[in-house]
Regions:
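Active-site-proximal specificity loops/subdomain of glycosyltransferases
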Residues: 55, 62, 72, 79-126, ...
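Short, acidic, metal-binding catalytic loop of nucleotide-sugar glycosyltransferases
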Residues: 21-73
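Eukaryotic short linear interaction motifs
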Residues: 13-15, 85-86, 136-137
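The conserved acidic donor/metal-binding loop of glycosyltransferases
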Residues: 131-135
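Hydrophobic targeting segments
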Residues: 2-7, 39-42, 74-78
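A conserved hydrophobic helix/loop-capping motif in glycosyltransferases and polysaccharide synthases
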Residues: 4-27, 31
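Short, well-structured alpha-helical interface segments that form or flank functional binding sites
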Residues: 37, 122, 139
């Protein structure tokens, strides 16, 4: 099954703001949440899995990639304004795409994200709009 997740993401600190996406002291928490919602969800739900194994006592620990029939073909898209985001700190992944939108009004970015999903829905079996701090724990969520 091919699944497309799309999420809006804005981090633009402003003094005395009540919103976490506008609070500098929340930067680390927001960065960790974005990492879990992107790379974490990709690692948890794709057909690509990683094993971490020791080569023996006092030997190296290695990481190996495995492909399984479990999971889905998952792509995650982050829809974000340039200069007002934390996406530059995410590791590269072939199934993670960052789209730097030209939308100036940050409150309209969720609408742009939804539009992107609708414009690309024919290429996927399932599409989903997700916030930038949501982790999908259930391994059967997409089944």
């Amino acid at each position: 099954m091919k699944v497309l997740l799309a999420m809006p993401h804005v981090f633009s600190p402003k003094e005395n703001s009540l919103y976490s996406s506008q609070t500098e002291s929340k930067r680390q928490q927001k960065q960790q949440a974005l990492l879990r919602a992107t790379i974490g969800n990709l690692n948890r739900h794709q057909q690509r899995h990683w094993i971490h194994a020791s080569l023996g006592k006092n030997k190296d620990v290695v990481n190996r990639e495995l492909q399984t029939s479990d999971g889905v073909s998952l792509k995650t898209v982050v829809f974000t304004p340039p200069g007002a985001n934390l996406s530059g700190e995410l590791p590269e992944d072939k199934n993670l795409k960052i789209i730097h939108t030209k939308i100036k009004d940050f409150q309209q970015i969720p609408l742009g994200t939804s539009r992107y999903l609708l414009e690309n829905c024919d290429d996927y079996d399932m599409i989903a709009y997700i916030e930038d701090d949501i982790v999908i724990q259930d391994p059967y969520f997409f089944t």
